[in-house]
Regions:
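Positively charged, solvent-exposed patches that mediate nucleic-acid binding
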Residues: 1-121
Length: 121
């Protein structure tokens, strides 16, 4: 099983924000190729962070949006395997995620990771 590893330093976020990005109705995803793959004890990690602006609802709404996006990425990892583990991702959630159904969000996340794979190759 692939585990998520979050970015934890502001300079890591700033470096990724200067790289490529893709926009959708539900989120903006920034991505950058890793210099080395992260493996600990033969476990694979995906470098990904979910970020929200403070002007979107209250903390409960922001956390629900992050949970929906995170579960959509987990489902893509399990079913489709279209996520490239050699990249670092930062996903900015938008307010539309809170209102819409999970299947729409899942389809959008899956399409975004396919587009990133096409851009990478």
């Amino acid at each position: 099983m692939i585990k998520f590893q979050s970015l934890n330093q502001s300079k890591q976020f700033l470096r990724i924000f200067k790289k490529k990005s893709l926009n959708t109705k539900y989120f903006t995803i920034y991505f950058e190729k890793n210099l080395s793959s992260v493996k600990k004890n033969d476990k694979k990690f995906l470098n990904i962070s979910f970020v929200m602006k403070k002007n979107i609802g209250n903390a409960v709404i922001r956390n629900k949006i992050k949970r929906k996006l995170k579960s959509a990425v987990q489902k893509v990892l399990k079913e489709k395997q279209s996520v490239d583990l050699n990249y670092t991702y930062v996903i900015f959630g938008r307010n539309n995620v809170y209102k819409d159904k999970f299947q729409l969000i899942f389809d959008e996340v899956n399409d975004m990771f396919k587009r990133i794979k096409q851009i990478a190759s």
